[in-house]
UniProtKB/Swiss-Prot annotation:
Belongs to the bacterial ribosomal protein bS1 family. The gene is rpsA. This is Small ribosomal subunit protein bS1. InterPro entries: NA-bd_OB-fold, Ribos_protein_bS1-like, Ribosomal_bS1, Ribosomal_protein_S1-like, S1_domain. GO terms for molecular function: mRNA binding; structural constituent of ribosome. It comes from Chlamydia muridarum (strain MoPn / Nigg). It comes from the Bacteria.
Length: 570
């Protein structure tokens, strides 16, 4: 019989330690009790109780700081009142409570009990019995800890910072005290801890709400949203759970550089639904579509050639934007700012904020572009340029600039012409205009050509006098004797300046019958020499001379050819 009693007690003990049982399981427990011949309230032998068991006890005394509980062992247990804090209002002598057996006997021979450990054990058993990873539980956020928050779900669970919300968190303290639903992410049986997530539920709710809202949204309807993000290309709005994009081109009919010029974060906007992509969950929004499109009748309102006034609102390297009415801007390109000046920077002509009169040049309605002209409000001096500067007209102009290929002169403010290096002298080979001209000086020249379309005028200085090469054969007939000054010595001969500045060349082979090592042995720059004209080439502006021929025909070295000719006549 004792074995039977021991057996039945052991069974009853095992049943008592089953925690957090649902009602149907408790009924099953009572049935097992009856099968073994005892009731749930029957006294239990104390010899079998081991530390770690949860026992039912009776409150026998209550003081300010302690509660004394009798669990039927050889001594009573004293438990701090702080462990009954959640149930202290209903606590009274004679009340039945569950406690955890820490020790059957301490150093003083007393039983050590814990109400708090019993509660935690029951909570843990409840979690194991009723919950699993993925379960949804309700709890209250109680405090902030390193890396997240603590949530009371019947026991303490950890809510990582990354799982608190699906939006950016500024202050964790704002969440303390909130009662929310959480999803159990992980249950660690060995460590007896639970990790939960609020973000996953919020995200699931958002996705569900987004899908529902996507089905409800219709193109053309008006909706209110909150600005949640501003980018260079547009604004993202929260439409009560679904994000919509308000592109910068759909914000206003006028031109803006950045969306922040019109909106700010957390601002509420009423927008129009432009398009919905249900598969990708994208919604395009419009703000300017709430207003009349000023471009609808733009071609009738601003036909090409019409003069309008507007305000300069933006300057760029290539031109100036002018607002001619609310939402309508046009571009004055730098090439349309002046008839006569080569404008590099719009600031040379206009400033931001200036009010100016312009002429409509063209309209591209589909692209929302208007081309405007500033110079068209003034007379174009090139319209009658051919009448004002006919070919052959002699003019006096100021030299404004010298280049490698010529000199630019100003005929009148904004009207310039070019004297090409080849039109500077009939006889001199000019290497650079600076050999003849200086910037700022005035020069007389002749109009050679006028290109109205290209806005180009060419002038010449040498054309002021007759071309001496036209009379070269009369001036220096082949076979005649001439005199000149040596101006340059080269390896192939010596150049001699003749009448009217014309140069002739004495080739090295035509210098002397006598042998010489180098030309400088018989000639020096500045020497006056006499020679015979042996060849003329007017087309290439060349006169060929020979000292040898001069001497061979009776001339004398060092004798002036003019004197020789005179003596021969005598």
């Amino acid at each position: 019989m004792p074995k039977q009693a021991d057996y039945t007690w052991g069974a009853k003990k095992n049943l008592d330690t089953i925690a957090c049982l649902p009602e149907d399981v408790k009924q099953f427990k009572d049935l097992l009790y009856a099968m073994h011949g005892f009731t749930a309230t029957e006294e239990e032998p104390t010899s079998e109780v081991q530390p770690g068991a949860i026992l039912k006890g009776t409150v026998v005394d209550i003081s300010k700081d302690f509660v004394v509980v009798d669990v039927g062992l050889k001594s009573e247990g004293v438990i701090p009142m702080s462990e009954f804090i959640d149930s202290s209002e209903g606590l009274s002598v004679g009340a039945e409570v569950e406690v955890y057996l820490d020790q059957t006997e301490d150093e003083e021979g007393k039983v050590v009990l814990s109400r708090e450990k019993a509660t935690r054990q029951r909570q843990w058993e409840y979690i194991l019995a009723h919950c699993e990873e993925g379960s949804i539980v309700k709890g209250q956020i109680t405090r902030k800890v390193k890396g997240g928050l603590i949530v009371d779900i019947g026991m303490e669970a950890f809510l990582p910072g990354s799982q608190i919300d699906n939006k950016k968190i500024k202050n964790l303290d704002d969440y303390v005290g909130k009662v929310c639903e959480f999803k159990i992410l992980k249950i660690n049986v060995d460590r007896r801890n639970v990790v939960v997530s609020r973000r996953e539920l919020l995200e699931a709710e958002r996705i569900s709400k987004k899908a529902e809202l996507i089905e409800q949204i219709t193109i053309g309807e008006r909706r209110k949203g909150i600005v949640k993000n501003i980018t260079d290309f547009g604004v993202f709005l929260d439409l009560d759970g679904i994000d919509g994009l308000l592109h910068i081109t759909d914000m206003t009919w006028k031109r803006i550089r950045h969306p922040s010029e019109m909106v700010e974060l957390n601002q509420e906007l009423e927008v129009i639904i432009l398009s919905v992509d249900k598969e990708k969950g994208r919604v395009a929004l419009g703000l300017k579509q709430k207003e009349h499109n000023p471009w609808e009748d733009i071609e009738k309102k601003y036909p090409p050639g019409k003069r309008v006034r507007g305000k300069i609102v933006k300057l760029l390297p290539y031109g100036a934007f002018i607002e001619i009415e609310e939402g309508i801007e046009g571009l004055i390109h730098v090439s349309e700012m002046s008839w006569v000046k080569n404008i590099v920077d719009p600031n040379e002509v206009v400033n931001k904020g200036d009010e100016v009169e312009v002429v409509v040049l063209s309209i591209q309605k589909d692209e929302g572009k208007i081309s405007l002209g500033l110079k068209q409000t003034e007379h174009n001096p090139w319209d009658n340029i051919e009448e004002k500067y006919p070919i052959g007209l002699r003019v006096t102009a100021e030299i404004k600039n010298l280049t490698n290929y010529g000199a630019f002169v100003e005929l009148e403010p904004g009207i310039e012409g070019l004297i090409h290096i080849s039109d500077m002298s009939w006889i001199k080979k000019v290497s650079h205009p600076s050999e003849l001209f200086k910037k700022g000086n005035t020069v007389e020249a002749v109009i050679l050509s006028v290109d109205k379309e290209s806005k180009k005028i060419t002038l010449g200085v040498k054309q002021l006098t007759p071309n001496p090469w036209d009379e070269i054969e009369a001036m220096f007939p082949v076979g005649s004797d001439i005199s000149g000054i040596v101006t340059k010595i080269t390896a192939f001969g010596a150049f001699v300046e003749l009448q009217n500045g014309i140069e002739g060349l004495i080739h090295v082979s035509k210098l002397s019958d006598k042998p010489f090592a180098k030309i400088e042995d018989i000639l020096s720059i500045g020497d006056k020499v006499s020679a015979k004209v042996i060849k003329l080439d007017p087309d290439h502006k060349k006169v060929s001379l020979s000292i040898k021929e001069f001497l061979a025909h009776g001339g004398h070295a060092g004798q002036d050819a003019e004197e020789e000719t005179s003596s021969n006549r005598d």
